[in-house]
Amino acid sequence: AQSLTKMAKLALALALAPAVTAFAPVAAPKAATKVDASIADTLATMEGPEIFWGSDGVLLGHDEADIKGYDNFDQLAAALSKEGVDLSGGEYTLLAPANSAFDKHNNEVGTPITADVLKYHVIEGKKTMDALNTDQKTLNGGTLTAYRKFRKNWLDGAIIGLKSEGPSKSSNWPSDVECDNGIIQAIDTVLVPGAYAGER
């Protein structure tokens, strides 16, 4: 009889559960995250693409595709500060070469990184990756040539938002990084005004 009473109580509780929850207060929606970091602040803390061990890691017990660390944007941040390129005054899209892109430029091209070169990486207004499919006017007065190749958007020979495709040593480059005064698109190449003479 006692077990029957327990079963009856359980059945009653289960029957009343939907009625009780029907009158429970609805959870408040989560507040939208406020974007309150400037382009400069975001650039200083933004993690870049993966750096893989490659063949150098094999002798150390690493697979070639193991991640060794992450690229970053220290050299770009330092160059902007040194050359006095201030991006705090409006909404901009910054095409941001990572440190590896600066190293490649210094080793293979060698032209100085001037304010004019840096402004060639800046477009007025917030432009998402999808909006960069047409030629773009830059802050230095030049024009970046846009084209589509290998199902990717390119500007002057730089891929916008390069993403890894499968289990390989290809890296993911940050794209559409929102800031309170603009947006950052990481690129794998330092852009030089007037240097691009390739395809559209």
Regions found by a protein language model. Give the residues of each.
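Low-complexity, disordered terminal segments
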Residues: 1-3, 86
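Mature, structured domains of secreted/extracytosolic soluble proteins
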Residues: 25-200
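N-terminal chloroplast transit peptides
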Residues: 1, 8-28
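Terminal low-complexity, poorly structured segments
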Residues: 6-12, 39, 114
